[in-house]
UniProtKB/Swiss-Prot annotation:
Entry keyword annotation includes Amino-acid biosynthesis: yes
Keywords from the UniProt entry: Amino-acid biosynthesis, Branched-chain amino acid biosynthesis, Leucine biosynthesis, Lyase
Organism: Neisseria meningitidis serogroup C / serotype 2a (strain ATCC 700532 / DSM 15464 / FAM18)
Record-linked InterPro entries: 3-IsopropMal_deHydase_ssu, Aconitase/3IPM_dehydase_swvl, AconitaseA/IPMdHydase_ssu_swvl, IPMI_Swivel, LeuD
One of the GO BP terms on file: L-leucine biosynthetic process
Pathway given in the UniProt record: Amino-acid biosynthesis; L-leucine biosynthesis; L-leucine from 3-methyl-2-oxobutanoate: step 2/4
Record's protein name: 3-isopropylmalate dehydratase small subunit
């Protein structure tokens, strides 16, 4: 998992509430259990004018010019700004995989669906909760300023605008530690590999019948 420390990046607006996981990555693309390769189909039904299916050459598909992420000014964005209850619907972990593979490192919203919120942290994607008033202000600034960028400092838990205004956000110490160090659940477990091996060896000696056969 990629570590997250600091970024300064373009912000792409998605001015919709209640964006569900089927909108983030439609169900027909869920056949793979690899974490990569979902980016070209993120927001597929809004992003393209035709119906997408696995195996299609996305470079030849007609783009929807009205979809914000297709606009030239938002190309290369690493921060997604959206509205309340983002990531609702089914619990598919493919949704944060698709956002990460698209290139997003952080998502800002007034609220997130709980399962999606937790899945973001497991996959190196930082979900930032701000108030609706703060999100409204950011939408206005993004719309008014082409190439608008925000700076996110995870260690300090701050988000800074080009004008120097700073917002703070909450995150548990455990989640912050994992993101700063690029640790998913497997990586976190491997940090304790020596203790695990020592425990297993001690148990092997004290309860050998468990290991016979």
């Amino acid at each position: 998992m990629k570590a997250f420390t600091k970024i300064t990046a373009i912000v792409a607006p998605l001015d919709r509430s209640n964006v569900d996981t089927d909108a983030i990555i439609p169900k027909q693309f869920l056949k793979s259990i690899k974490r990569s390769g979902f980016g070209p189909n993120a927001f597929d039904e809004w992003r393209y004018l035709d119906h997408g299916e696995p195996g299609m050459d996305n470079s030849k598909r007609p783009l929807n010019p009205d979809f914000s992420l297709n606009q030239p000014r938002y190309q290369g964005a690493q921060i997604l700004l959206t509205r309340k209850n983002f990531g609702c619907g089914s619990s598919r972990e493919h949704a944060p995989w698709a956002l990460d593979d698209y290139g997003f490192r952080a998502v800002i919203a007034p609220s997130f669906a709980d399962i999606f919120f937790n899945n973001c942290y497991k996959n190196g994607l930082l979900p930032i909760v701000l108030t609706e008033e703060q999100v409204d202000r950011l939408f206005k600034e993004v719309e008014a300023n082409e190439g608008y960028q925000l700076s996110i400092d995870l260690a300090e838990q701050t988000l800074t605008t080009p004008g120097g205004e700073t917002f703070t956000f909450d995150i548990t110490e455990h989640r912050k530690h994992c993101l700063l160090n690029g640790l998913d659940e497997i990586g976190l477990t491997l940090q304790h590999a020596d203790e695990i091996h020592a425990f297993e060896e001690k148990r092997r000696q004290s309860q050998p019948w468990l290991f016979n056969g």
